From Swiss-Prot:
The lineage of its organism: Bacteria, Pseudomonadati, Pseudomonadota, Gammaproteobacteria, Enterobacterales. Catalyzes the attachment of alanine to tRNA(Ala) in a two-step reaction: alanine is first activated by ATP to form Ala-AMP and then transferred to the acceptor end of tRNA(Ala). Also edits incorrectly charged Ser-tRNA(Ala) and Gly-tRNA(Ala) via its editing domain. It catalyses: tRNA(Ala) + L-alanine + ATP = L-alanyl-tRNA(Ala) + AMP + diphosphate. Its EC number is 6.1.1.7. It is an enzyme of class 6 (ligase). This is Alanine--tRNA ligase. CDD domains: AlaRS_core. Pfam families: DHHA1, tRNA-synt_2c, tRNA_SAD. GO terms for biological process: alanyl-tRNA aminoacylation; negative regulation of DNA-templated transcription. One of its GO terms (cellular component) is cytosol.
Length: 876
C-alpha cells in the first residue's frame, strides 16, 4: 500500500533527522526581512541570511517541509493552475540543508538512500535519471562511480540560457553572491507517456519528471563575474512534496494524489458538482490551500501587494465555483477538509480556523455582489469583439469597477479562444500607479538597499549609554569611509544600546558623540545582524574605526517601554474578554501611542472596550513583576508563550512574563513592573480589513492628558449649555429635542413656500405643439425641494415638460420632469443630459424624471434657453 502525502512528508523529515539534521518548522508565507520576495517560494528562503553569512544558527544541518506560494511577481503560475498536472499556487517544498557542513558526496548519497532504500521510498533505481552541470566532474563521478548510475542516465547540462553560468543546472541567488552548480534527479514514468529525457527536444513532455534539485553553493560571484570559491561550501535542496507523492502513489498528475482527491471531493460536495474530472474542481482545490494558509499567516484581502494577490486567488476560485453552479457561499466551507487532510502541517491553520473561514466568507460575499454584473459586461464586450483579442482598457475597467483581476478575465476569454491585451492592461495599471505615487510623494528608500557584512551586539536591555566603535558608514545606500557635518548617513557600531525597530516597537532616537563630533540619531533599523543608526552628522566629521559614545533618548525610551508592556497586557485582556480566537495581526509601539491589530469579526461593543480597559488597569494596580527568561523556542511554546505575528524567532528566545496574566515571546524593551504603566486608556477601535480590528491606546502621562482633555471638553459643553457636568446629558437631550422640533417646523415652511412657488410658476408655462413647456431658474430654493415642485407642477399642467434649476454655493442643480404621455417623444434623461453638458456636469434618470448637477453657473441661462428649441425639434 502506497504512503499518504502526510506519511511521505513525515518520512522525509524522519530520514534527515536520523542523519543529524535539525527539523526546523516551516516559516511564514510572508518572508521576514526580505523586501525582494512577495511570498516565501522556496525552502531556503528562511535560511537566506545563513547562506549569506549574516545569521548564525546553533546547528549546521537542517531539514524542513516549507509551505510555499507562487502567484504574482516572477513566479506567477496562476493562469496555469488547474489546467496542467503540476502547476500550483501553494505547494510544500521538502528540503535538507548544510551550512558549511557536508557537501556533494553526502548530499548525493543521502538523496539516493532516501529514494531507493527499501526502508524509505523504495523507488526502482532503473527509473531514476540525473543531470549535472556540464563542468561539474565531481558530481558526475559521484553519481557514476559511487552511486553506480550508468553513464547513459547521467546528463551534462551546459549554459542553455544564453550567457555564462546561465543554465538549468547552475543556481545563483542574484547577480552577485553565493552560487553554484546543481544536480537534478528525474523519475521516468515509462514509455506509455510522451516525453524525452532532460536536455532532449522532447524534455517538456510528462514522461521524465524532476523530483529533486540539489544545489551546491561553492562560489561567491563577484561584480565583475569572476567566481571565488567559498571557504565553507553549503548545500540547499528542494523536492516538491506533491511531485514525489505522485511518483510514490503511482499517478501521473499531482491532482490525483490522495491529498487532492480528498479536497476535490470536498469541493464537489459544497458546490453540487457531479463531474469529478471538471478542471474547476482542481482550481478550487488548489486555491483553498494558498488562500487559507496566507490568511493564517496574516495576509488579508486588499487592493495592493500581497493582499491583492490573495484577493485575485479567492476571486478566481469563486468564479470557478460559479461555473460549477454553486448557489451560495462555498469557499470557506473547505477550510475544515483542508485542515483534516494536511495532518500535522495543518496545526497552525486549525488554531485560526474560525478567523480564516470568516475572512473567506466575507470576501466571497462581497465579490458575489459584483461578479454577475462584471460577467455581464464582459459578455457584452466579447459579443462586440471583431478580432480575437480583448483590449487592455476594457480589462482594466473590469478590474477597476468590478474588482475583476486580469487573470480572471483571461480565464473567461481563454474558454472562448480569445486573448487579453495584457500589455495594454499593464499600461493602464502603471498609469494608475504613477498617479498614486505622485499623490503619495514617496521616493526611493536607499536604506532598504544596504547590505552589511558586520554584526552589532545589542546591549540596550541593560544599558542606556555605552562606548562603541564605528564598523561601517553608508550614505544613500553606498558604503563610505567617512562623513562630514551636514551629511545624512547610516552608522553601524560594534555594540550599541539603541533598539532597532522590531516586533512593532519603533527604533530608538538619541545621539552618537565624541570629542569633535555629534551625530543625531533619528531612527534605528536592523540590516541583517547589524544595527544601523540613521540620522545626520550635526558637527565635526566621523569615519570608520572611530570610537563613539552612544546615548539613547532616555525619556522617549521610557515612554515606549510603558506602551510596549501595556500592549502585552491588552493582548491578554482581549483574549479574556472576546475569546481565544484573538491573535495579533500587527502592532506599532512608539512613545506617543500603541496600536494593535487583532483578529475579530465584528466591532467591539462599548462595554467590551470598557471591560478590556478595566482588566488592563487592574493588572497595573496589581503591580506585577515583568520578568524575562531565555529558553528554547519549543520550551517557550510548551509554557504557553504566545508568538507575535510576523516575527522571526531564533532557537533561543526571550520569554516575557507579567505575573500570571501574560506570557509572550518578545525581544522588545519593557517596564520593570506593571505598576510603572500608571494608567491605560483606549482612544479608538476600528476595522482595517475583513476580520481584523485595530485598537489605539495611550498610557501613563499620555493617558492622563486624554483624561484632562475629556474633562475640559465636558466643561466647555456644560458652559455652552448653561449647566454643569452633573446634568449635562439631560441638557443635551433637551437641546436636541428642541432642534428636531424647529427643523420639522422649518421643513413645513419650506414645503409651503415651494407649493406657493409652484402655483406661481404654472402660469409661466408655454405651449409647444400641444405640450406645456416650463423652464425656470429659481432662487432661494433648496435643491432637494426641486423634485417636490416638479411633482406638483406635473399634477397642475397635465401634458407637460418641466426643467427647473437652482444655484447654491456655485453649484448648479437641475431636474427635468416629463408627463408619461409625452415620454415616447421626449425622455427626461436625454433632456437633462443635454442641459447638464452645457453647465459642466452630467446626470440621468428615468424617462419621466431625471436629475443632474453642474459646476458652471455662468452658463446656466444659455443652457436653459436652449431647451425650447431642443423640445420643439423632438415634438415635431
Amino acid at each position: 500500500m502506497s504512503k499518504s502525502t502526510a506519511e511521505i512528508r513525515q518520512a522525509f523529515l524522519d530520514f534527515f533527522h536520523s542523519k543529524g539534521h535539525q527539523v526546523v518548522a516551516s516559516s511564514s508565507l510572508v518572508p521576514h526581512n526580505d523586501p525582494t520576495l512577495l511570498f516565501t517560494n522556496a525552502g531556503m528562503n528562511q535560511f537566506k541570511d545563513v547562506f549569506l553569512g549574516l545569521d548564525k544558527r546553533n546547528y549546521s544541518r537542517a531539514t524542513t517541509s516549507q509551505r510555499c506560494v507562487r502567484a504574482g511577481g516572477k513566479h506567477n503560475d496562476l493562469e496555469n493552475v488547474g489546467y496542467t498536472a503540476r502547476h500550483h499556487t501553494f505547494f510544500e517544498m521538502l528540503g535538507n540543508f548544510s551550512f558549511g557542513d557536508y557537501f556533494k558526496h553526502d548530499a548525493i548519497q543521502f538523496a539516493w538512500e532516501l529514494l531507493t532504500s527499501e526502508k524509505w521510498f523504495a523507488l526502482p533505481k532503473e527509473r531514476l535519471w540525473v543531470t549535472v552541470y556540464e563542468s561539474d566532474d565531481e558530481a558526475y563521478e559521484i553519481w557514476e562511480k559511487e552511486v553506480g548510475i550508468p553513464r547513459e542516465r547521467i546528463i551534462r547540462i551546459g549554459d542553455n540560457k544564453g550567457a555564462p553560468y546561465a543554465s538549468d543546472n547552475f543556481w545563483q541567488m542574484g547577480d552577485t553572491g553565493p552560487c553554484g552548480p546543481c544536480t537534478e534527479i528525474f523519475y521516468d514514468h515509462g514509455d506509455h507517456i510522451w516525453g524525452g529525457p532532460p536536455g532532449s527536444p522532447e524534455e517538456d513532455g510528462d514522461r521524465y519528471i524532476e523530483i529533486w534539485n540539489i544545489v551546491f553553493m561553492q562560489f561567491n560571484r563577484q561584480a565583475d563575474g569572476t567566481m571565488e570559491p567559498l571557504p565553507k561550501p553549503s548545500v540547499d535542496t528542494g523536492m516538491g512534496l506533491e511531485r514525489i507523492a505522485a511518483v510514490l502513489q503511482h499517478v501521473n498528475s499531482n491532482y490525483d494524489i490522495d491529498l487532492f482527491r480528498t479536497l476535490i471531493q470536498a469541493v464537489a460536495k459544497v458546490t453540487g458538482a457531479t463531474d469529478l474530472s471538471n478542471k474547476s474542481l482542481r482550481v478550487i482545490a488548489d486555491h483553498i490551500r494558498s488562500c487559507a494558509f496566507l490568511i493564517a499567516d496574516g495576509v488579508m484581502p486588499s487592493n495592493e501587494n500581497r493582499g491583492y494577490v490573495l484577493r485575485r486567488i479567492i476571486r478566481r476560485a469563486v468564479r470557478h465555483g460559479n461555473m460549477l453552479g454553486a448557489k451560495e457561499t462555498f469557499f470557506y466551507k473547505l477550510v475544515g477538509p483542508l485542515i483534516d487532510v494536511m495532518g500535522s502541517a495543518g496545526e497552525d491553520l486549525k488554531r485560526q480556523q474560525a478567523q480564516v473561514e470568516q475572512v473567506l466568507k466575507t470576501e466571497e460575499e462581497q465579490f458575489a455582489r459584483t461578479l454577475e454584473r462584471g460577467l455581464a459586461l464582459l459578455d457584452e464586450e466579447l459579443a462586440k469583439l471583431s478580432g480575437d483579442t480583448l483590449d487592455g482598457e476594457t480589462a482594466f475597467r473590469l478590474y477597476d469597477t468590478y474588482g475583476f483581476p486580469v487573470d480572471l478575465t483571461a480565464d473567461v476569454c481563454r474558454e472562448r479562444n480569445i486573448k487579453v491585451d495584457e500589455a495594454g492592461f499593464e499600461a493602464a495599471m502603471e498609469e494608475q500607479r504613477r498617479r498614486a505615487r505622485e499623490a503619495s510623494g514617496f521616493g526611493a528608500d536607499y536604506n532598504a538597499m544596504i547590505r552589511v557584512d558586520s554584526a552589532s551586539e545589542f546591549k540596550g536591555y541593560d544599558h542606556l549609554e555605552l562606548n562603541g566603535k564605528v564598523t561601517a558608514l553608508f550614505v544613500d545606500g553606498k558604503a563610505v569611509d567617512a562623513i562630514n557635518a551636514g551629511q545624512e548617513a547610516v552608522v553601524v557600531l560594534d555594540q550599541t544600546p539603541f533598539y532597532a525597530e522590531s516586533g512593532g516597537q519603533v527604533g530608538d532616537k538619541g545621539e552618537l558623540k565624541g570629542a569633535n563630533f555629534s551625530f543625531a540619531v533619528e531612527d534605528t533599523q536592523k540590516y541583517g545582524q547589524a544595527i544601523g543608526h540613521i540620522g545626520k552628522l550635526a558637527a565635526g566629521s566621523l569615519k570608520v574605526g572611530d570610537a563613539v559614545q552612544a546615548d539613547i533618548d532616555e525619556a522617549r525610551r521610557a515612554r515606549i517601554r510603558l506602551n510596549h508592556s501595556a500592549t502585552h497586557l491588552m493582548h491578554a485582556a482581549l483574549r479574556q474578554v472576546l475569546g481565544t480566537h484573538v491573535s495579533q495581526k500587527g502592532s506599532l509601539v512608539n512613545d506617543k501611542v500603541l496600536r494593535f491589530d487583532f483578529s475579530h469579526n465584528e466591532a467591539m461593543k462599548p462595554e467590551e472596550i470598557r471591560a478590556v480597559e478595566d482588566l488592563v488597569n487592574a493588572q497595573i494596580r496589581r503591580n506585577l513583576p515583568i520578568e524575562t527568561n531565555i529558553m528554547n523556542l519549543e520550551a517557550a511554546k510548551a509554557k504557553g508563550a504566545m508568538a507575535l505575528f510576523g516575527e522571526k524567532y531564533d532557537e533561543r528566545v526571550r520569554v516575557l512574563s507579567m505575573g500570571d496574566f501574560s506570557t509572550e515571546l518578545c525581544g522588545g524593551t519593557h517596564a520593570s513592573r506593571t505598576g510603572d504603566i500608571g494608567l491605560f486608556r483606549i482612544i479608538s477601535e476600528s476595522g482595517t480589513a475583513a476580520g481584523v480590528r485595530r485598537i489605539e491606546a495611550v498610557t501613563g502621562e499620555g493617558a492622563i492628558t486624554t483624561v484632562h482633555a475629556d474633562s475640559d471638553r465636558l466643561s466647555e459643553v456644560a458652559h455652552l449649555l448653561k449647566g454643569d457636568s452633573n446634568n449635562l446629558a439631560d441638557k443635551v437631550r433637551s437641546v436636541l429635542e428642541r432642534t428636531r422640533q424647529l427643523e420639522k417646523e422649518l421643513q413645513q415652511l419650506k414645503e409651503q413656500a415651494a407649493a406657493q412657488e409652484s402655483a406661481n410658476l404654472s402660469s409661466k408655462a408655454i405651449d409647444v405643439n400641444g405640450v406645456k413647456l416650463l423652464v425656470s431658474e429659481l432662487s432661494g430654493v433648496e435643491p432637494k425641494m426641486l423634485r417636490t415642485m416638479v411633482d406638483d407642477l406635473k399634477n397642475q399642467l397635465g401634458s407637460t415638460i418641466i426643467v427647473l434649476a437652482t444655484v447654491a454655493e456655485g453649484k448648479v442643480s437641475l431636474i427635468a420632469g416629463v408627463s408619461k404621455d409625452v415620454t415616447d417623444r421626449v425622455k427626461a434623461g436625454e433632456l437633462i443630459g443635454m442641459v447638464a453638458q452645457q453647465v459642466g456636469g452630467k446626470g440621468g434618470g428615468r424617462p419621466d424624471m431625471a436629475q443632474a448637477g453642474g459646476t458652471d453657473a455662468a452658463a446656466l441661462p444659455a443652457a436653459l434657453a436652449s431647451v425650447k428649441g431642443w423640445v420643439s425639434a423632438k415634438l415635431q
